[in-house]
């Protein structure tokens, strides 16, 4: 997943990493007067050094030799915003006069914010401007981009706030977070604040709808030095109303910062929510972002919210060791064209009958905890207790899970605890603005990841604070949303042991202990819940984790891509099982969100690239026959059952990228009406029905023979299962020509095919069987009800 996270930097809207009164980016010279042309240094110059909101501001760019814009003769424009790009008045590449820079000399351009900085950005954004973000670019930025780095210029306000002396008092609550009173008319806020040097901020205040976002000593928080909490109780609350709020914290050394509550269950995002309202995903009647009154992500609370009436309250996974999981991304499951509004929970719920008919018994949702922006895979989390509004409301999430449970389908959640974005309150609280990373004194995060597989900001899982946070979040998700388990992203990174790409997967007892502690929390909250790890470490470590009850992703994509293309090399399936692992310890998959689609490579490369669709789908049916019949947990990536053949490199604009990307992919529900693709779906469904109806035959004790190496290619691959009363044999021909092979059945008599035909076996040790090209035969010792 590591490479995919790199892509996220390009697709999330604007992350909320504004840290007030601080300058990020390249150094900008301090000036005590407006500079002459001769005084300008290479790079950015601005006057005044700190803009005043009610005064004019000027910015010069002097290009140095080697810069993109050095010697450029065309028009130059600025791309500009405020508060670390939280508000940007125009799309990238818009060439309007308002954004045009004045050329004042060769390789020197000037841009002026007039009549004042605030007036230039407009009244709706005039309040709480902390910094101006700017870069200079050419006039052909959409086709031949030339630009500078980002520069950030501090803006000082017209108002000043002088905090009162901090009152030391015992906090009435035991946990950080939001604590309503029994009657809902008051609420106590508690925020943990103690860095690794045992220091804390100079003061903290509450701002929000309850005080019209005014910073005042009346709402200055008290300090409990035993619990290391800032806390305050707000009275006069309407229990039926939602309120937005933030913590405003300051110190002489670090300046001021606004953060939300890390335990809040809903947030408002001034940069992105408006699009959800326009699309009808987020109700216009619900609480909205307080534009013009604050900046950054806003937390929301309600002291007496309506409770969801669960229709199924006692769902249990029947057999976690034999699950078939359907990995699903809401965004790309029902999206049509550019209408992101269709990629929602409501639309996905309408297709649950399709998933149920397929025969899977679990859905694994890609990350849905609040992430930066609206358009994402979700591996860029910022608020873990809030579900992202990009797909729907809290109630709709619960309705989806409830409907799945009604249909006998478990719901697993992909959780991302390896890292968080800079929008996370813990990251913002102790932040190194010059380096754009968490500070050395941050008690939750590493400055740099000790392992090579991380982006954003790396959690330190040796920290008791991090462990408490993760455990609390897991318990919350199991109890509040009734998730049936989790897939943990990038657990290889849950360590403080320094490593490189060659050693990161080596046996690590500290990593085992950390994951075992999280598993204990999951198990204590719901003994039936499952915990799956994206681990990819040495098998000796994976074995220990599996023996403790966890399951681990196991990537079989390469082998099944090769067989899907009709290529025998590197197509060995035998790696699906290993004598060193507990038989049910691996969750095997042919495809996942991270892997290239088998059907795409089949149509683009290999022996079948010019074959008709009917042939290619038959080959994929044969793949499925040697995947879904193997005992142990399995996972299917969405639409693999229809031969989805758009590459993971496919870009949103319809072109092919040079590497994998997280762009939205076309949703091809029309594939379900195409004869041969529907035939592939039907084969999946038939195999899964056979699996679900005969669990004793798909237990590990029933696994008898597995001849699926490269050397078995020409004579046909073979699988045999036997329980005390039932037997199953699969023979597969991945070649593009018919084969005749001798098959071991174990006993003579009638055997039954999936299509209802009967084979009379007369030679139990070597029955001659003809297998058509690109096909399989599945025989059972009992009649199958299809």
Provide a role label for each language-model segment:
Residues 10-44, 166, 171:
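Bacterial Sec-dependent N-terminal signal peptides
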Residues 59, 161-204, 258-321:
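Basic K/R-rich, polyanion-interacting modules in nucleoproteins and related proteins
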Residues 69-126, 139-153, 186-242, 250-273:
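Aromatic-rich carbohydrate-binding modules that target alpha-glucans
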Residues 222, 367-369, 377-380, 405-407, ...:
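Active-site-proximal helices and loops of the catalytic beta/alpha 8
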Residues 264, 268, 274, 278, ...:
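Substrate-binding/active-site clefts of carbohydrate-active enzymes
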Residues 277-329, 572-587, 594-616, 620:
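Glycine-rich phosphate/pyrophosphate-binding loop
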Residues 763-786:
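C-terminal beta-strand-rich structural cap/linker in extracellular carbohydrate-active enzymes
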């Amino acid at each position: 997943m590591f490479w995919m996270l790199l892509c996220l930097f390009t697709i999330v809207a604007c992350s909320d990493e504004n840290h007030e009164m601080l300058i990020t980016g390249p150094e900008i010279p301090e000036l005590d007067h407006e500079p002459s042309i001769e005084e300008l240094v290479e790079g950015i110059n601005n006057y005044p050094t700190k803009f005043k909101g009610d005064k004019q501001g000027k910015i010069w760019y002097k290009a140095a030799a080697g810069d993109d814009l050095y010697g450029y003769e065309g028009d130059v424009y600025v791309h500009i915003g405020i508060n670390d790009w939280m508000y940007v008045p125009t799309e990238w590449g818009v060439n309007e006069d308002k954004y045009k820079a004045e050329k004042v000399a060769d390789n020197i351009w000037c841009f002026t914010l007039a009549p004042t900085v605030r007036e230039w950005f407009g009244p709706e954004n005039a309040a709480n401007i902390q910094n101006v973000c700017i870069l200079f670019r050419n006039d052909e930025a959409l086709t031949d981009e030339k630009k500078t780095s980002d520069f950030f210029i501090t803006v000082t306000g017209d108002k000043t706030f002088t905090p009162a002396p901090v009152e030391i008092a015992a906090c009435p609550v035991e946990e950080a977070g939001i604590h309503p009173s029994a009657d809902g008319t008051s609420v106590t806020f508690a925020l943990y604040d103690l860095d690794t040097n045992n220091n804390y901020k100079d003061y903290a205040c509450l701002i929000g709808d309850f005080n019209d976002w005014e910073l005042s000593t009346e709402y200055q928080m008290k300090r409990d030095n035993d619990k290391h909490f800032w806390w305050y109780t707000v009275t006069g609350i309407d229990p039926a109303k939602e309120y937005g709020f933030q913590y405003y914290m300051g110190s002489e050394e670090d300046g001021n910062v606004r953060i939300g509550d890390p335990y809040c269950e809903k947030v408002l995002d001034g940069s992105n929510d408006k699009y959800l309202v326009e699309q009808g995903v987020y109700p216009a009647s619900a609480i909205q972002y307080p534009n013009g009154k604050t900046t950054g992500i806003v937390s929301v609370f309600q002291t007496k919210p309506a409770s969801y009436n669960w229709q199924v309250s006692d769902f249990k996974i029947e057999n976690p060791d034999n699950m078939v999981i359907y990995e699903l991304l809401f965004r790309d499951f029902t999206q049509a064209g550019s209408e992101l509004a269709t990629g929602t929970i409501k639309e996905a719920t309408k297709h649950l009958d399709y998933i149920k008919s397929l025969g899977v018994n679990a859905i694994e949702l890609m990350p849905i905890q609040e992430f930066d922006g609206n358009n994402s895979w979700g591996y860029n989390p910022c608020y873990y207790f809030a579900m992202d509004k990009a797909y729907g409301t809290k109630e709709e999430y619960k309705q989806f899970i409830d409907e799945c449970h009604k249909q006998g389908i478990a719901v697993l959640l992909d959780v991302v605890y390896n890292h968080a974005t800079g929008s996370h309150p813990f990251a913002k609280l102790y932040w190194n603005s010059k380096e754009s990373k968490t500070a050395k004194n941050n008690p939750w995060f590493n400055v740099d990841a000790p392992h090579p597989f991380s982006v954003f900001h790396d959690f330190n899982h040796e920290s008791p604070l991090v462990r408490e946070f993760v455990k609390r979040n897991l318990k919350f998700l199991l109890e509040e949303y009734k998730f049936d388990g989790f897939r943990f992203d990038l657990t290889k990174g849950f360590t403080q042991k320094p490593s490189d790409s060659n050693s990161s997967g080596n046996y690590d007892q500290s990593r085992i202990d950390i994951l075992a502690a999280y598993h204990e929390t999951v198990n204590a909250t719901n003994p039936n819940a499952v915990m799956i790890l994206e681990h990819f470490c040495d098998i000796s470590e994976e074995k220990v984790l599996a023996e403790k009850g966890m399951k681990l992703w196991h990537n079989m994509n390469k082998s099944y891509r090769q067989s899907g293309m009709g290529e025998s090399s590197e197509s060995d399936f035998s790696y699906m099982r290993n004598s060193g692992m507990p038989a049910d310890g691996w969750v095997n998959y042919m495809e996942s969100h991270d892997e290239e689609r088998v059907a795409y490579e089949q149509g683009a490369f290999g022996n079948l690239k010019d074959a008709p669709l009917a042939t290619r789908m038959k080959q994929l049916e044969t793949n499925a026959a040697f995947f879904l019949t193997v005992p142990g947990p399995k996972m299917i990536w969405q639409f693999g059952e229809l031969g989805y053949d758009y590459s993971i490199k496919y870009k949103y604009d319809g072109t092919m990228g040079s590497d994998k990307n997280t762009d939205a992919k076309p949703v091809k529900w029309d594939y379900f009406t195409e004869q041969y693709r529907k035939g592939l779906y039907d084969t999946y469904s038939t195999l899964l029905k056979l699996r679900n109806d005969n669990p004793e035959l798909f237990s590990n004790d029933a696994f008898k023979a597995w001849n699926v190496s490269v050397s078995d290619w020409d004579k046909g691959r073979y699988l045999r299962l036997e329980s005390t009363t039932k037997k199953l044999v699969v023979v597969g021909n991945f070649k593009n020509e018919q084969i005749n092979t001798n098959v071991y059945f174990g006993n003579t008599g009638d055997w039954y095919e999936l299509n209802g035909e009967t084979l009379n076996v007369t030679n139990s040790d070597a029955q001659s069987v003809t297998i058509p090209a690109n096909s399989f035969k599945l025989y059972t010792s009992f009649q199958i009800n299809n």
